[in-house]
Amino acid sequence: MKDFLEDYKKSVLERKSEGIPPLPLNAKQVEAVVEILMKDPTNAAFAKELLIHRVSPGVDEGAKVKAEFLAQLSQKKLECPHISALEATTLLGTMLGGYNVEPLIVGLESQDKNIAKESAKALKTTLLVYGSFDKIAAMSKTNALAKEVLESWANAEWFLNKEPLNECIEACVFKIDGETNTDDLSPASDAFTRSDIPLHAKAMLKNRIENYEQRIEAIKTKGVPVAYVGDVVGTGSSRKSATNSIMWHFGKDIPFVPNKRSGGIVIGGVIAPIFFATCEDSGALPIVADVKDLKEGDIIKIYPYKGEITLNDKVVSTFKLEPETLLDEVRASGRIPLIIGRGLTNKARKFLGLGESEAFKKPSAPKSDAKGYTLAQKIVGHACGVKGILPGAYCEPKVTTVGSQDTTGAMTRDEVKELASLKFDAPFVLQSFCHTAAYPKPSDVSLHATLPGFITQRGGVALHPGDGVIHTWLNRMGLPDTLGTGGDSHTRFPLGISFPAGSGLVAFAAVTGTMPLNMPESVLVRFKGEMNPGITLRDLVNAIPYYAIKKGLLTVEKKGKINVFNGRILEIEGLPDIKMEQAFELSDASAERSAAACVVRLNKEPMIEYLKSNIKLIDEMIASGYEDKETLKKRRDAMQAWVDKPVLLEPDSNAQYAAVIEIDVAEITEPILACPNDPDDVATLSEVLADTTGKRPHAIDEVFIGSCMTNIGHFRAFGEIVKNAPPSQARLWVVPPSKMDEQELINEGYYAIFGAAGARTEVPGCSLCMGNQARVRDNAVVFSTSTRNFDNRMGRGAKVYLGSAELGAACALLGRIPTKEEYMNLVSEKLESQKDKIYRYMNFNLMENFRL
């Protein structure tokens, strides 16, 4: 006891010096707290406060110890002089769900009427009851208090007893001009602290503005709630930590939940879709409105029901809250609590023979004269058990495949615990360790040791550090025409559809097997024509924003930003026979368009080829000891069933799109690349070289070949171009996306070529692409095959171009961006005659002696 108190008080002081609260108690610490309460009256008051306020809820390990102790007190099996049986029952009711539910159900039958009533009162506000609902329903036939609990749920008292949003909200503006991406709000270099919300929040905006801590603290002294305001807010990664940081600074404490806050206000001219959804999930109020007349320090009034923002009693901006259920979401403390609670209310009403509840806002049916459905609308419809879902409709589709990666995995674990779940209902949940494998910190090593078991115990599948990028694996676990999600903005399946999400929604999807969705509109990109020699899939990726800019559907300028793709589904057709790895290049880059999702219309043949390969991969995973075996077997069997009877959904010819962009690939005669530092700022090779302003530098310091945007063909092509050439003129990084690619490249002799070229080869994974571990040199000019090139992402002050591996090889040889002629000559000389050999893909079922 003494050691615990000394150690704990020391840690409190250490964190207080940083301006943050102590960490929540772990299981051993809770055991020590219980011992103090039972044996040490001198420190009992302090220990009681810790037990009440410093233990995470749900199925956290500490919550188990807390619930078991309180249950013994509530049931009078144990006496504590500092917590009565009645108070113990009350405290059980603060734990949200999980380990506290069974003791409260037992309490309904207590001989002590006060404890029985208190148990009922606690259960009325407990939403995370899952299978225990049936137990309470059965009890209600003979137990009046159990029936009272059901009636309370049926009447949505848990919701109606919460205060609705005020008619007028006074707030102080904290404004970041231009674009704020999620790396600004949650820097990759601090990814290892993400699950420690208060500590991670200290890094918010440190790379974006000067004196960031003083500026944030100064705005909090205004005495009114703070609204985070920006022209464009939340682009980039799906990291919920970005939202957590805003809420930590500007939100409200959650009673009995340590180190977490909810609420807060975000106002943006454009709010990226994943970030918007994460705000919804967390109980924040996201508002899309013109912000040009809002300045930092302004005291504004927000009228959420009227849709007006006033400054000095003058209307300076108007808005319409969307989705229609947003006010309910805020009232319920978030979209996820609303969905769970609404489901509980409906279940109780059905059991009691009551009609539909009138307590909640019902989404209106979408107003549309559409007669047909797009491919995306049909896939989502299929996941909902209907023919299609039109834009504007609210739905909760079944989720077939869920992905979680390591820099968000610890947060997802915390969210799963908070959801009080011990089993995943989603058929396939995959956890990777791709972002922290290369240069793990002690916290990463701990995560590598503890997270796999947490996932596999719940029926998920855990990869190993060094296996490679999550998307390379998760794509191979997908099924045609099904829906998925993942805690990474590049969760963009090349088959079916996936809606990336923050860690909270990923946990919800894994736990429940469903996810909420307000169906977005679709933008159709239709390719036609034949590709010219030297033109790559990556050039087609960059052609999408290039042609959108031409049509006035996309602007690079952030103020008054136009982006036809933002929040919509990108649907791509016209390339029906490309391989799945190539299709992923297209779907993956929809993240940089800020699209909600992407579908690529393909023929059956590439899908059959891909699934046959993936069946072999799963067989080898099982043979190599990957867990959970049953989950892997079920997914393999589902793949085989589709291969045996392959049927694909098709879009209707009369489907409607928000916009149609047609791209004749024959018009593309030279590479297209994204320029520093914006994935929307695309230009042809000639246009880049013609730019003498200095914004598009021509000398290249470093070249990176890697990320989820690459496949084995890119590395062979790169190798062939640099083969037998003098060592690279630029610092060179080579990082295959998976250990399977790495081994095959070694077997084929390409690693020897990379070494001779002076390349630094890394563990398969995401390190340099994300910039959370390896970094390019400060102020370097970089050519990269990676996903995005936001300021400071790959290195402080770095200027980063994005393009193909083939163009990267030319940059490496020359130390500069080549001319069109130089590039075409290299490709023609080195690649053209052996294209079939170079651009072969990883068909494991056809590879001799393939083993993991």
From Swiss-Prot:
UniProt record, GO biological process: propionate catabolic process, 2-methylcitrate cycle; tricarboxylic acid cycle
Catalytic activity, reaction form: citrate = D-threo-isocitrate; (2S,3R)-3-hydroxybutane-1,2,3-tricarboxylate = 2-methyl-cis-aconitate + H2O
Cofactor remark from the record: Binds 1 [4Fe-4S] cluster per subunit.
EC top class named in words: lyase
Keywords attached to this entry: 4Fe-4S, Iron, Iron-sulfur, Lyase, Metal-binding, RNA-binding, Tricarboxylic acid cycle
Entry EC no(s): 4.2.1.3, 4.2.1.99
Gene3D superfamilies from the UniProt entry: Aconitase, Domain 2, Aconitase, domain 3, Aconitase, domain 4, Aconitate B, HEAT-like domain
Record keyword Iron present: yes
Protein's pathway: Carbohydrate metabolism; tricarboxylic acid cycle; isocitrate from oxaloacetate: step 2/2; Organic acid metabolism; propanoate degradation
Disulfide cysteine pairs (residue numbers): none
Binding sites annotated in the UniProt record for [4Fe-4S] cluster: C708, C766, C769
InterPro entries: Acnase/IPM_dHydase_lsu_aba_1/3, Acoase/IPM_deHydtase_lsu_aba, Aconitase/3IPM_dehydase_swvl, Aconitase/IPM_isomerase, Aconitase_4Fe-4S_BS, Aconitase_4Fe-4S_dom, Aconitase_B, Aconitase_B_HEAT-like_dom
Record's keyword annotation contains Chaperone: no
Biological function: Involved in the catabolism of short chain fatty acids (SCFA) via the tricarboxylic acid (TCA)(acetyl degradation route) and probably via the 2-methylcitrate cycle I (propionate degradation route). Catalyzes the reversible isomerization of citrate to isocitrate via cis-aconitate. Catalyzes the hydration of 2-methyl-cis-aconitate to yield (2R,3S)-2-methylisocitrate. The apo form of AcnB functions as a RNA-binding regulatory protein.
Record's protein name: Aconitate hydratase B
Species per Swiss-Prot/TrEMBL record: Helicobacter pylori (strain J99 / ATCC 700824)
